[in-house]
Amino acid sequence: MRARIRHTGIVVVDLEEALRFWTEVLGFEIKVRMDEAGPHIDAMMGLEDVRVTTAKLKAPDESMVELLQFHSHPDVAAWGGDASSTGLTHIALTVDDIDAVCARVEAFGGALVA
């Protein structure tokens, strides 16, 4: 049996802004967007009374990213803030035209770092 990654989930503070970045800057397509709640979501998240809006985005290569904005639970900034902190530290993307993507990142208000 071989496994493959279905999607990567990323919690965001502002889903609308995150969607604009992933679609307009990186070219992902929104496949599914929904408000979720209920016992099955509570069990999946390991929390009680969860209310979350999710959006699944598909890249041109068929890989998926899921963005999650929680409405029921405040952000808990437990991440230590450096590369050795436990948790997600980065996601690597491959693009066809790095210069064009960098220009879109800057136009979106992002900063490029070397």
Placement of each model-derived feature along the sequence:
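Core segments of cupin and vicinal oxygen chelate
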Residues: 11-62, 100, 107
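Histidine- and/or cysteine-centered catalytic micro-motif in compact active-site loops
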Residues: 35-36, 70-72
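Short hydrophobic/aromatic-rich motifs at helix boundaries and adjacent loops
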Residues: 26-28, 72-75
